């Protein structure tokens, strides 16, 4: 039995014996024979069951270019190392994304050139320069790897910059700034209590955040109680 007869027996319009797949419609048949899973199983099958030198596509890749020109393109694609059971499957492959992508890489690698022309890459260095702007007593030399204020680690400088530009870090930095301002007027005991529960002992009121506490200190009620104390 010839290898072509064996291939036709393995890959029919209604069933793929290599993958044990039932093919109901033409679209399902084309999609299956075009899939990477099918191609991988076919290569593995020919490795385990070599006939007439193995898979035609594999055999032709080891030969010179002049021999490859004599290959029937409706039976195999030497560029993608794939074999076909019919002209319909072959035509679908040549019009598909996988073949087009590999053909572009072979002819001149146009895809990498497009990525270098994008304006995204030159925008990254200026954003990196804005990282040291964040002033904090928790700032460390390796601030592009760790934020002591938020106890956050970073895998790269871009991730660090996104953190410093985020709401969470800015909110924590604002709290630290307020605590530093209040620290000049409060003693250490009051400051420690403030860090825990934001309570004003003069007005006997508890607040939910440092921002509310700071606003309360500037309010008329607190100022009146402070004068009457």
Swiss-Prot record:
Q: Which SUPFAM superfamilies match?
A: beta-beta-alpha zinc fingers
Q: Give its localization.
A: Nucleus
**Keywords carried by this UniProt record:** DNA-binding, Metal-binding, Nucleus, Repeat, Zinc, Zinc-finger
| This protein's name | Zinc finger matrin-type protein 4
Which InterPro entries does this entry report, sorted A to Z?
Matrin/U1-like-C_Znf_C2H2, ZN346_ZMAT4, Znf_C2H2_jaz, Znf_C2H2_sf, Znf_C2H2_type
**One GO CC term, this protein:** nucleus
An annotated Gene Ontology molecular function: identical protein binding
Q: Which Pfam families match?
A: zf-C2H2_jaz (PF12171), zf-met (PF12874)
Answer yes or no on keyword Thylakoid: no
Superkingdom to which the source organism belongs = Eukaryota
Q: Which organism is it from?
A: Homo sapiens (Human)
Residue ranges, annotated region (Disordered): 116-135
Q: Taking the first listed entry, what is the main subcellular location of this protein, grouped into a coarse class?
A: nucleus
Query: Zn fingers (Matrin-type): where?
Result: 14-44, 72-106, 145-175, 198-228
């Amino acid at each position: 039995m010839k290898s072509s007869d064996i291939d036709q027996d393995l890959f029919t319009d209604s069933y793929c014996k290599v993958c044990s797949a039932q093919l109901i419609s033409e679209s399902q048949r084309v999609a299956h024979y075009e899939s990477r899973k099918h191609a991988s199983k076919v290569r593995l099958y020919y490795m385990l069951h070599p006939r007439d030198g193995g898979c035609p596509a594999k055999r032709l890749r080891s030969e010179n270019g002049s021999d490859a020109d004599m290959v029937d393109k409706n039976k195999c694609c030497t560029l993608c190392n794939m074999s076909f059971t019919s002209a319909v499957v072959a035509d679908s492959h040549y019009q598909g994304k996988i073949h087009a992508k590999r053909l572009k890489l072979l002819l001149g690698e146009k895809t990498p050139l497009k990525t270098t022309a994008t304006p995204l890459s030159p925008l990254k260095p200026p954003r990196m320069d804005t990282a040291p702007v964040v002033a904090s007593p928790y700032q460390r030399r390796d601030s592009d790897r760790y934020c002591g204020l938020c106890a956050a680690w970073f895998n790269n400088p871009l991730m660090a910059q996104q953190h410093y530009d985020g709401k969470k870090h800015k909110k924590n930095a604002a709290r630290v700034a307020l605590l530093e301002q209040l620290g000049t007027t409060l003693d250490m005991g009051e400051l420690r209590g403030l860090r825990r529960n934001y309570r004003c002992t003069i007005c006997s009121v508890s607040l939910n955040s440092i921002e509310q506490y700071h606003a309360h200190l500037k309010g008329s009620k607190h100022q009146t109680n402070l004068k009457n104390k």
